[in-house]
Amino acid sequence: MGKKKKTLRNDGFVNAFTGQGVKSRDPFASYNVDSEIPLYDKEIDNLYTYNGIARKIVEIPADDAVSEGFKLVNGSDEIEQSKLVMSELEDIKWDNKFSEALSWERAMGGSAILMMINDGRRFDEPLDLKSADKIERLDVYSKQDISATGSYYSDPSDPKYGRPYMYTLINEYGNSINVHESRLLLFRGGRISKEERRFRDGWGGTVFDVIQRRLI
């Protein structure tokens, strides 16, 4: 039986010169995860209003999302009413309104579009689709101007269980109105954990959550 060859290990010798595996010298040996602190709404508002790069980051994807329009289809076939619907929506400048709502969602973590529909009911009552004639106007609200009133769906079998069914909206003049959620198109913000969403009163993430250090 032959002699076992000795294995020469000079890792420690080499590492002493290269720094490999040494935490203080090898950037791949260890790393720290720094958590970002969410910006206050006013900080985001100022950033979006006065920082040109921040505004582009918010608005360009929002504008692109609506630039091609859309069509109504059944399977792969466009339905007969599609062009009529688009014509009606163009009359109320749907693309500008949706781009604005998407921009506020990206910037603030949430927004909503109030659909002004004459169905013979009050704003705080559920929308009656059978009596609804047409969408007369679309009004956009940022997350800052929307608050749940404390009324929630309580039936566990309801797909909307736990969600608010009544919101208070405040316009630019300070006037407020209670609105049933069926009259709103809600944009709930970027994907975050349920725990973080609870911390943010049901709203989601913003584009500034992960890039704020590069802008401030």
What are these regions (language model features)?
Residues 45-207:
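Structured, mid-chain assembly/scaffold modules that mediate subunit interfaces
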